[in-house]
């Protein structure tokens, strides 16, 4: 075939991935070659005639082989993009999805509803890589806020802490407490400190059923952490526990946004009503599927949703 250049490598990689039924063949080839050469994807196309070194060719070949095993690109490159940040990720954490960015949008919007001189306490349950908590700290335009981010995996928390330290300025990373807990820390000190003081609750909990897990794409099923995906027999088990356990910690006027799946949205709505006695709003994602449950919870008045 002669000398290899960027164009030939891309064309070969895309065609090879298509023949092997690798999802997003073009994107996979572009990202892998971009990583090897240290180019942006745009720069690849501006440097079609660049001829990689032998070492670069060998590295590209190695990454191609990993992708053929259906290992997600994010795990191969150990990085994932979420809103305006780049996160370090491993197989100990779920790869953040674009739909989850909607949770951040809802929380940022809710913050504007609180008085300007109030300290805002935000809790995220199931932080994983820290994508949501770090994005909130990065994008919040107020100074008086504190974020508590919990996860039941110590390895995930190590990654989240590392991401916060590398992405955020110290004054912002210091405002996030990463705590090991299934949902809510059980120690008395935490309960005394945050009882009735959480203003905003966000969570992207597991919501896949046991049977649903078997139907997931191979690259998800074999490589992403099952504990972060599967909730149980129905897929809705985690929500009822979240709703019940966070209730004593919510402030007098608090906001909640949790990610859901359209297969469990009806059940989750009923679980919310049973705990809080009111009706939240379900918002759609980019594909018009039920994706985010949002609600204002006022303990001295009927619940008001944040829906438009």
Write out the residue ranges for each language-model feature:
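Mobile active-site "lid"/loop adjacent to the S-adenosyl-L-methionine
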Residues: 206-237
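Conserved Class I SAM-dependent methyltransferase catalytic core
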Residues: 233-296
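Residue-level signal for inorganic ion chemistry
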Residues: 32, 70, 100, 132, ...
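Conserved AdoMet
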Residues: 35-110
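C-terminal lobe and adjacent flexible extensions of AdoMet/dcAdoMet transferase-like proteins
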Residues: 294-300, 308
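Conserved hydrophobic residues forming the short capping helix/wall of the S-adenosyl-L-methionine
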Residues: 17, 111, 164, 168, ...
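A short N-terminal interaction module
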Residues: 1-60
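Conserved SAM/SAH cofactor-binding pocket of Class I
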Residues: 102-215
């Amino acid at each position: 075939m002669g000398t290899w250049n960027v164009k030939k490598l891309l064309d070969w990689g895309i065609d090879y991935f298509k023949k092997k039924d690798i999802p997003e063949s073009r994107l996979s080839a572009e990202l892998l070659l971009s990583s090897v050469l240290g180019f942006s994807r745009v720069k690849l196309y501006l440097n079609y005639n660049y001829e990689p070194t032998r070492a670069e060719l060998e590295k590209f070949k190695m990454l191609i082989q990993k992708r053929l095993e259906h290992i997600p690109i994010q795990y191969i490159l150990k990085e994932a993009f979420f809103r305006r940040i780049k996160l370090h990720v491993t197989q100990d954490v779920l790869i953040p999805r674009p739909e989850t960015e909607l949770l951040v949008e809802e929380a940022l919007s809710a913050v504007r509803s609180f008085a300007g001189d109030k300290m805002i306490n935000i809790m995220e349950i199931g932080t994983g890589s820290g994508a949501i908590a770090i994005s909130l700290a990065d994008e919040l335009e107020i100074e008086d806020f504190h974020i508590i981010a919990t996860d039941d995996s110590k390895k995930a928390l190590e990654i989240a802490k590392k991401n916060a330290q590398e992405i955020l300025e110290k004054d912002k990373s210091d405002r996030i407490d990463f705590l090991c807990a299934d949902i809510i820390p059980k120690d008395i000190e935490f309960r005394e400190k945050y009882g009735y003081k959480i203003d905003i609750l966000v969570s992207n909990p597991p919501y896949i059923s046991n049977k649903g897990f078997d139907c997931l794409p191979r690259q998800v099923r074999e490589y992403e952490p099952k504990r972060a995906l599967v909730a149980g027999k129905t897929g809705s088990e985690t929500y009822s526990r979240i709703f019940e356990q966070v209730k004593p910690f919510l402030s007098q006027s608090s906001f909640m946004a949790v990610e859901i799946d359209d297969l469990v949205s009806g059940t989750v709505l009923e679980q919310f009503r049973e705990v809080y006695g009111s009706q939240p709003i379900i918002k759609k994602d980019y594909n018009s599927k039920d994706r985010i449950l949002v609600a204002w919870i006022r303990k001295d008045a009927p619940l008001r949703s944040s829906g438009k």
